[in-house]
Amino acid sequence: MYALGDWRRTHYSSEVNSEMDGQEIIIMGWNHSIRKLGKLVFIILRDREGTIQIVAPKQKVSEETFATAKSLGKEDVMAIKGKVVANEKAPAGFEVIPIEIKILNKADTPLPLDPSEKVSADIDTRLDKRFLDLRRPKIQSLFKLRSEVLKSIRNTFHDNGFIDVDTPKLVASATEGGTELFPISYFDKEAFLGQSPQLYKQMMMAAGFDRVFEIGPIFRAEEHNTRRHLNEAISIDCEMSFADEKDAMEILEKVINNAFTDIYNNNQKELQTLGIDLKVQETPFPRIEYTEAVDMVNAKGVEMEWGEDFSRPAEAALGEMMDGFYFITDWPTEIRPFYTLPNEDNPKLCKAFDLMYKDLEISSGAQRNHKYDLLVEGIKRMGLNPEGFGTYLEAFKYGMPPHSGWGVGIERLMMIMACQQNIRECVLFPRDRQRLTP
């Protein structure tokens, strides 16, 4: 008992089928469920790829194997060497008759959470016992989709000439001058966890890297306690030289469209497990100007002044009128970050955009201000001290090209794709205002 020995898995559950009739296999996983019917034991073994039925008839297996089968408890870890037997009456058209069963570890009882989902639990209980919650097939399917989405996004970036970079997550000042920072002890200096790779992405444009992307953690000390906010998230960021905001939106559309297309083509099993009928939206996505969006919100009976950001009621009103992905463009300069480039013909508006999905903000982006003097003016206009951005500003003195970019939170993207109402469902171990463990 408990020793793997020289056994190694030959197949995942999904790889076994009735055409393997008579073949000997080794499968490994957890005891998802068990039924003991006198001289017959039915075991459902669960692994990463699904479940498989093992049938142990007393008259066809050794006495030791039958006794081991009967002794299995729920969520015990096991390895089974057995023979595939085609059986039209079996749910999958076959079953596995065990030759030998190894119990690799026993699970304590009672279980604090039921991975078979026969007993429901609220989200706080599930997150407290997340290691058990993550065994649930639906949850595993969601994170398989997440992995494939990130793979698709990386492929799209590489196919379009972007270089993968990693920027510091320990920083000396705020990216956008805000107070939403987590301070940390950094020897004898003041430091913070990075809230965005924005300034470093722009410095890479000055370095001549032309097109870069990064997928990494961001930290924001926002006191939101909603189903849409996290204090630690994974951000997908890109920056591109010699490009305006329209070029940035085009790349963003391509990234989103390719991810949805790849998932639709390659991950129907996971989509079916989650009960999702995935739709791939055609590009280009609709575009509406900020001023038009404000008028639409007011027409819905939600009061909003020009120059304000969209409140939750305003976003909800837009979501009732707009279906799927769409861009909001031409924002007021005063409410966008200091590095956003104003329009030449109307400086009150800037070359910024948000990507929305119904009422949910997915991404913010813009063409950036690449002129040193104008950037310093923008910093001062926001009530910030340019001296706090010395290293960043220096990069603009020696030939910074025009550039644009954006950032997307993978968790919000997965909320859309996996039809989740709570962003915590899309994170292995979420960090929010109340939760620092597990």
UniProtKB/Swiss-Prot annotation:
Catalytic activity: tRNA(Asx) + L-aspartate + ATP = L-aspartyl-tRNA(Asx) + AMP + diphosphate
Binding site for Mg(2+) 2: E361, S364
UniProt-listed SUPFAM superfamilies: Class II aaRS and biotin synthetases, Nucleic acid-binding proteins
Domain of life: Archaea
Protein name: Aspartate--tRNA(Asp/Asn) ligase
Positions that bind Mg(2+) 3: E361
Originating organism: Methanococcus aeolicus (strain ATCC BAA-1280 / DSM 17508 / OCM 812 / Nankai-3)
Subcellular location: Cytoplasm
Cofactor(s) the record lists: Mg(2+)
